[in-house]
Amino acid sequence: MAVTDTESPHLGEITCGTLLEKLQEIWDEVGESDDERDKLLLQIEQECLDVYKRKVEQAAKSRAELLQTLSDANAELSSLTMSLGDKSLVGIPDKSSGTIKEQLAAIAPALEQLWQQKEERVREFSDVQSQIQKICGDIAGGLSNEVPIVDESDLSLKKLDDFQSQLQELQKEKSDRLRKVLEFVSTVHDLCAVLGLDFLSTVTEVHPSLDEDTSVQSKSISNETLSRLAKTVLTLKDDKKQRLQKLQELATQLIDLWNLMDTPDEERELFDHVTCNISSSVDEVTVPGALARDLIEQAEVEVDRLDQLKASRMKEIAFKKQSELEEIYARAHVEVNPESARERIMSLIDSGNVEPTELLADMDSQISKAKEEAFSRKDILDRVEKWMSACEEESWLEDYNRDQNRYSASRGAHLNLKRAEKARILVSKIPAMVDTLVAKTRAWEEEHSMSFAYDGVPLLAMLDEYGMLRQEREEEKRRLREQKKVQEQPHVEQESAFSTRPSPARPVSAKKTVGPRANNGGANGTHNRRLSLNANQNGSRSTAKEAGRRETLNRPAAPTNYVAISKEEAASSPVSGAADHQVPASP
């Protein structure tokens, strides 16, 4: 138990004295001799001396290392201050005061700050030198991939300012060169546009970087590029001058030929792009394509063509004027005989009994009169078109009203319903349209002392016939409604007598059309026919035209709701004013 107690002393009470006392107690218990005890004590003392000695050596070594570190720091500090310049010496502490660690602690922040300044200064020098090297390469026309070497022995602000001044001069030179390049490129673009040349291929032949996709700062500014651009501009200007001279010569020839053959303005306008520059200077021609090669070739071809057509030009002019006259009459729905008119022109020109100028003047007079007549007919023709459109809607409305499924929920039914509402409103205006049309037509006939014909058919006769046929149609519809009531009466009586429920044999819809409308026949066998206002059918019913009238004249389609009648019926029917035959519009 005693040994255990000696091996477990309280750690907090261990000192050299307690350990020595403990050792004495152990020796006493063991019975060590005094010699042995002295020997062990000497051994302990020697070991303590060795420990102290090692600690002293370690401390001396650490001091030497600190001194070396301090020396290196001072040397580095001196090197940095010399490299960065005198202005960087501000804030450096006194190196000879305080302990070694204090001196190191004082130098470390300044040294770190100087290192940061050096790194920043190196980056600035590298950036400036890289820009200088790049601009010099751009001017020389070569690309250099070498990284600039920064002389770290001299990083002073003075040297940095020198580099920056050099960079500013180079940047100014680059800006001037870039401005010249852009001016040249813009000039080339304008010249290529006027000459009809491919701008992209032209500038890329000078240098690939001059295309529109390359950024401005990436365009070549080398001496060679500027020289080639200047030569290109000079070449294009010479080409522009030569082409303008050629075009002006052709324009003069064209004008002479036009004046000789009295070419109309419409044909001359086709070559306005040629004649517009007849008195322009080189600098005044700026319209894109104005001097294109194909345009000059086109003018040359036209001059050659006009030279060859001098003899036969008068016939062409006369026929063009005749076509213009026929077009005016066609738009005004006035029937003419173009074949006989053209034969007359041919005979007059071939006979040589009339001067070409007199013939053209006479045709111009006819054209003027035709325009006046067309203008006087315009109001009535516009109303005829509205009337025909209303009749078309009336025909559609009748077909719509006969449709048993018009109120179903099918796709597009609501659109037809809206159209039907608009059609009913429009159809209700037909009587007023006819009244106004009749009044204006009669006033026109009184003023001009002639019948107003629409594609050869007297308009009043058309309106009278329309009113009569509309009245007949209303009477037929009224008769069909009465017949329908008579046919449905037995079914109603049977249902009221036997049952209130609908019979399986009862018609599904009360709106079903019964009678001749359903089978395109009348109640008494009368055939329900359509009247068309085209040339063929008008010829069969018009009292103002011959039976063999021409059937090839193009006219607008007639309303599809007319009921056609034969010549004999039309001839035997009394003809009166349209107002006498107007009836209310169908619902």
UniProtKB/Swiss-Prot annotation:
Chain spans, region Disordered: 474-587
Molecular function GO labels: microtubule binding; protein dimerization activity
Location within or outside the cell: Nucleus; Cytoplasm; Cytoplasm, Cytoskeleton, Spindle; Cytoplasm, Cytoskeleton, Phragmoplast
Outcome of mutating T526A: Impaired microtubule binding and abnormal subcellular localization (e.g. reduced localization in spindle midzone during anaphase) leading to disturbed mitosis
GO cellular component, one term: phragmoplast
Modified residues (Phosphoserine): S503, S532, S540, S573, S576, S586
InterPro entries: MAP65_Ase1_PRC1 (IPR007145)
Superkingdom field: Eukaryota
Pfam family, one: MAP65_ASE1
Tissue-specific expression: Expressed in all organs and tissues with the exception of sepals and anthers. Bound to subsets of microtubules in the cells of root epidermis, hypocotyl and cotyledons (at protein level).
Induction (UniProt): Expressed throughout the cell cycle.
Keywords for the protein's UniProt record, in alphabetical order: Cell cycle, Cell division, Coiled coil, Cytoplasm, Cytoskeleton, Microtubule, Mitosis, Nucleus, Phosphoprotein
UniProt-reported outcome of changing S532A: Impaired microtubule bindingImpaired microtubule binding and abnormal subcellular localization (e.g. reduced localization in spindle midzone during anaphase) leading to disturbed mitosis
PTM characteristics: Basal phosphorylation at all stages of the cell cycle. MT-binding properties inhibited by hyperphosphorylation mediated by CDKs and/or MAPKs (e.g. ANP2, ANP3, MPK4 and MPK6) during prometaphase and metaphase.
Chief location category: nucleus
Effect of S503A: Premature binding to microtubules traversing the central region of the metaphase spindle. Impaired microtubule binding and abnormal subcellular localization (e.g
Coiled coil: 46-84, 151-181, 234-257, 290-317, 461-489
Protein name: 65-kDa microtubule-associated protein 1
Gene: MAP65-1
